[in-house]
């Protein structure tokens, strides 16, 4: 099956073809770290977590980068309000963010670059833009001259003439045109600052992501993602400055998540209608929150309500009940020497639902449709267990493996399969102990010691007691 992705840049679904076969380089805009993450943030990071998991499931090697904006107007403003040092404030909320994402079972990015650790890279990028004639120095900083980038607006659809209507350059601003945006801001009293060719100051917001993404993913990469609210001006400005600098197409696929809505309004800090991840986790499990998010396509608005979360909880419990029914049935199931009509019917239902699941996921990661297929399997296998005179282990195993796959992609059912995984690990350890014992009998001590050392690196310690070897888990 061919994976098709909706590209915000072209406003249509396109066949996904990475730049390098078998490899996906992906950048997701991370948080500005000045407060606790809320459900609106979590929705975006859960969505991209599932996208990443599905790409990996399809066999791609994914390199994922997510930045931390650890210096920004919002951070400076909050630090002044609380009397904290901006750097310490940012560090505190980086820790909070990482803890919250771990709690939500969001896999860590491969690289988490911070703005404050890439100041020199940012300065060099701005100098390249100046050399190419796209940037100029004003009285209060360095600006990108938007009108010089002829494709400005190709992501968001905004027109320069519309931006200029009613806009004006305020007195004291150093930019030539209202639409120009800051690449470097000259220092104001009491603000964090760094040395640069244009005097002390700090980076503008948009330049940060262009610099950090291209440093780790190259001057062209596959996927750039974030929330809908970043399409303009942030991502539009990123494209302008990056393609002006590099002289070619920068990102191939732009993906954006829909808003979380509360009574018809976007969930946001400014409106005060938000619920933090930590507040949600006091009432619901991480898997319920993930399930709630995945019931909607990632580009669609997601309506937040307690009723919606409770509905997600009930639906997830239904699937857990199905897993338990399968587990119990497998303990008493027969090996299949022949199949009857019920066996074929259940097997074909699972096979068709599995096809629908992958068809939905290949259609722009449509988790909402994919979940319908999951419930089709749930209904079919429960019916089979109830009606079949003697359920066959092979049919039950097909459903079991399907649920395991869904769990790995969606980040759910983890607790259920954890016990089974532990049993499989124990069998493998016991097998290695037997192999090691045979090697010792044959006086191949070097290989026997190699097994012991490799297991120790994995947190398994072997202890020889006479003719017996026991093992225990240790911290590594």
UniProtKB/Swiss-Prot annotation:
GO biological process, one term: cysteinyl-tRNA aminoacylation
Pfam families: DALR_2 (PF09190), tRNA-synt_1e (PF01406)
Chief subcellular location: cytoplasm
Record-annotated disulphide pairs: none
Gene3D superfamilies, alphabetized: Cysteine-tRNA ligase, C-terminal anti-codon recognition domain, HUPs
One Gene Ontology molecular-function label: ATP binding
Residues the record lists as binding ATP: 269
E.C. number(s) listed in UniProt: 6.1.1.16
Record: residues binding Zn(2+): 29, 209, 234, 238
Needed cofactors: Zn(2+)
Compartment(s): Cytoplasm
Motif mapping: 'HIGH' region: 31-41
GO cellular component, one term: cytoplasm
Signal peptide: none
Keywords, ordered alphabetically: Aminoacyl-tRNA synthetase, ATP-binding, Cytoplasm, Ligase, Metal-binding, Nucleotide-binding, Protein biosynthesis, Zinc
Primary enzyme class: ligase
Positions of short motif 'KMSKS' region: 266-270
SUPFAM superfamilies (UniProt xref): Anticodon-binding domain of a subclass of class I aminoacyl-tRNA synthetases (SSF47323), Nucleotidylyl transferase (SSF52374)
Family annotation (InterPro entries): Cys-tRNA-ligase, Cys-tRNA-synt_Ia_DALR, Cys-tRNA/MSH_ligase, Rossmann-like_a/b/a_fold, tRNA-synt_1_cat_dom, tRNAsynth_Ia_anticodon-bd
Annotated protein name in UniProt: Cysteine--tRNA ligase
Organism name: Pyrococcus horikoshii (strain ATCC 700860 / DSM 12428 / JCM 9974 / NBRC 100139 / OT-3)
